[in-house]
Curated annotation (Swiss-Prot):
The keyword Ion transport belongs to this UniProt entry's keyword annotation: no
Keyword rRNA-binding: yes
Coiled coil: none
Gene3D superfamilies: 3.30.160.20, 3.30.230.10
Recorded GO MF terms: rRNA binding; structural constituent of ribosome
Function noted in UniProt: With S4 and S12 plays an important role in translational accuracy.
SUPFAM superfamilies registered for this protein in UniProt: dsRNA-binding domain-like, Ribosomal protein S5 domain 2-like
Subunit structure: Part of the 30S ribosomal subunit. Contacts protein S4.
Name of the protein: Small ribosomal subunit protein uS5
Domain S5 DRBM residue range list: 48-111
Higher taxonomy: Archaea, Methanobacteriati, Methanobacteriota, Stenosarchaea group, Halobacteria
One GO CC term on file: small ribosomal subunit
Family, per entry: Belongs to the universal ribosomal protein uS5 family.
Domain comment, as recorded: The N-terminal domain interacts with the head of the 30S subunit; the C-terminal domain interacts with the body and contacts protein S4. The interaction surface between S4 and S5 is involved in control of translational fidelity.
Length: 212
């Protein structure tokens, strides 16, 4: 695999990707090497999609007067098990979105999917493999395996994140201020991240910290 658009990797993981030693995102995540270059994801997941979940204008008073920045909440995924989440801030909306996308790529995880519902038995990876919970601020989200054909039983924000992750069927339960999109999306991502933690060896996951 050759470098894309003149990318010259600076990390060991990036070099292994360019040299063809690592040729899948799952292999990269299981390598134990920290993911610090978004270009790694660009190379290994060319079909990655992004979804802007929320855009907010944030005002702050400084010595020079009122400063305005935009905060964007973004999720990225390939609809086949890979999902990332991040927030980005910038003076311009476009800049905030791009920052969030780049950071979300560095936060990408491989969700543990399966046919985890006792009501089903198809053996396809259409739902989460196990019950999981996630929390962000006052919001708590619980995801439970569901039988094939149920669909995504949850709010719009939850559905957008789960669709990008490749989850087709799910039972959800949420509490707290779920109208706050940023916390609702982050709690959902944290729940999915817990499924990844449950199956990845500790020595590998200890370096996978979510970037703020």
């Amino acid at each position: 695999m050759s470098a894309n658009n003149g990318w010259e990797p600076r990390t060991r993981l990036g070099k292994q990707v360019v040299e063809g030693e690592i040729d899948s995102m799952q292999e990269a995540l299981n390598s134990g090497l920290p993911l610090k270059e978004s270009e790694v994801v660009d190379q290994l997941v060319p079909d990655l999609e992004d979804e802007v979940l929320d855009i907010n204008m944030v005002q702050r008073m400084t010595d020079s007067g009122r400063r305005v920045k935009f905060r964007c909440v973004v999720a990225v995924g390939n609809r086949d098990g890979l999902i990332g989440y991040a927030e980005g801030r910038d003076d311009q909306v476009g800049g905030a979105i791009q920052k969030a996308i780049d950071i979300a790529k560095l936060n990408i995880i491989d969700v543990s999917r399966g046919c985890g519902s006792w009501e089903c038995g198809c053996g396809r990876p259409h739902t989460v493999a196990l019950r999981t919970e996630g929390k962000a601020g006052s919001v708590e989200v619980e995801l439970q395996p569901a039988p094939r054909g149920l669909g995504l039983a949850g709010g719009e924000t939850v559905r957008k994140v789960l669709e990008l992750a490749g989850i087709e069927d799910i039972w959800t339960r949420s509490s707290g201020n779920t109208r706050t999109t940023v916390n609702f999306a982050k709690a959902t991502f944290n729940a999915l991240q817990n499924t990844a933690e449950a199956r990845v060896p500790e020595r590998t996951f200890e370096k996978r910290e979510v970037i703020e």
